[in-house]
Every structure is written in structure tokens, then in C-alpha cells.
């Protein structure tokens, strides 16, 4: 298991992470805490939020800081990353988070996850897609070098609706956040109509390497959402990276 140390990100905020992944940790912190990429709507204090692709817990920590009374259902399949997620919840004394060590998909399965110890947030069930994406990155760039170390780990994948169906008296899902490195459509197709009807907002980050952008946008619109599209300013011009921000009509 990768070494984990506490990384100080601001005067009053630190997280546990693999120190070799510090570049990625700082990037995610900026994206969520400074650029506020998930501040897509005002949410109720007691929001119910789904974190698909929990990584080391940065999104969940941000939402719990902003909405302390919220309930968050989080999913992270990589064992080392899930362990770090749990340590970060303990570090910040967070309650109201139900974390599951699994990925989300259209059906239950056991699949091979390609894990990047120095870039764990890029770990993927679709390694070929990730390899194709990296072709648009200069191979001398630090990110390309950090992505060179990989290994495979077998992980469980389950349907999101199977978890939502076990939540007592679930009235609304105020936000579904999906950042799952190529498995976005799998996550969305693991939702039954009864649960789609409960969702108010969806934010999906995806790289359109296999036509999923149009498919995801069409699916979200068919479920009653107005979909806005943003391109992250950090993405290279030939990397088809998008944020789909879907709000219920």
C-alpha cells in the first residue's frame, strides 16, 4: 500500500494522501475549494448528496464544510484510496457520510481497475481510454511521468439504485456528482426511473473519447434536466474534457 502522509493545503486545511500524489491533490483542492466547480446551485442544509468517485474525499469534505447537516453517500473502488478517504473523514471528524468500497455501474460485477498510485484520481476501469487521452499530453509533462506507474486491482462494481433503494424515507437527491474516469454512462445507467425522479442536480465530468458526451447529454435531457456544458480551462485543446451541469426543469 502506498505511503500516506498529511499534506497541508491551506493554513486551516490538510488531508492525508500519498505524498507522491501531491500535484494531483493540490489540483483537486483548487478545482473544488477555490474554483468551486460544484457550486452549481444553493442546496438545503440537510441535503442528500451522492459522491460517485470519492477519491481521497475532497468533494465530500467540501460539501460537509458547506452543508454540515447533509448526508453523503460516497463510493470509491480502489482499496488504498478508499482507506485514505476514511482517514480523511476521521481527520476532519466528519459524520453523516456513508462510504462504500466499490465502483458504480449498470450491473453488479468484479472488474479490473487500473490504479495509478501517484495519480489515484485518474484510476480507471477503462485503461485504453485513459491511454488515448494521455496522447494529448506532452510526455515530458509531470503528469505524464506520474501516470507511468500502474498496477491492476480487482474491484467490486454495484448499481447506484441498489444503494438508494436502501435509504429510509429518501425524498430527494439534491446532487449527484459523477467523476469516475470513463465509467460515467455506467453509473447513470445503474439508476432506475424511480430514483431518477428524485434527483435535482447532476454534475458529470467526462472525457469524450468514445462518444459519451452526446450520449450522457441526451440521457440527462430525457430524464427532465436542462444541461449546461463547460470546458475546464486547464484542459489541452485536443482533450475533449467537459463538465455537464444538469438541473431539473
Swiss-Prot record:
Record-stated family: Belongs to the FkbM methyltransferase family.
Associated pathway: Secondary metabolite biosynthesis
One Pfam family cited in the UniProt record for this chain: Methyltransf_21
Superkingdom, natural source: Eukaryota
Inducers of expression: Expression is positively regulated by the cluster-specific transcription factor tenR and is induced during cocultures with the natural competitor fungus Metarhizium robertsii.
Protein name: Methyltransferase 1
A single MF term (Gene Ontology): methyltransferase activity
Root EC class: transferase
Protein function: Methyltransferase; part of the pathway that mediates the biosynthesis of tenellin-type 2-pyridones, iron-chelating compounds involved in iron stress tolerance, competition with the natural competitor fungus Metarhizium robertsii and insect hosts infection. Methylates pyridovericin-N-O-(beta-D-glucopyranoside) produced by the UDP-glucosyltransferase GT1 to yield pyridovericin-N-O-(4-O-methyl-beta-D-glucopyranoside) (PMGP). The pathway begins with the assembly of the polyketide-amino acid backbone by the hybrid PKS-NRPS tenS with the help of the enoyl reductase tenC.
GO annotation terms (biological process): methylation
Disruption phenotype: Impairs the production of detectable pyridovericin-N-O-(4-O-methyl-beta-D-glucopyranoside) (PMGP).
This protein's UniProt keywords: Methyltransferase, Transferase
This protein's record includes keyword Transferase: yes
UniProt key word Flavoprotein: no
The enzyme's E.C. designation: 2.1.1.-
Protein species of origin: Beauveria bassiana (strain ARSEF 2860) (White muscardine disease fungus)
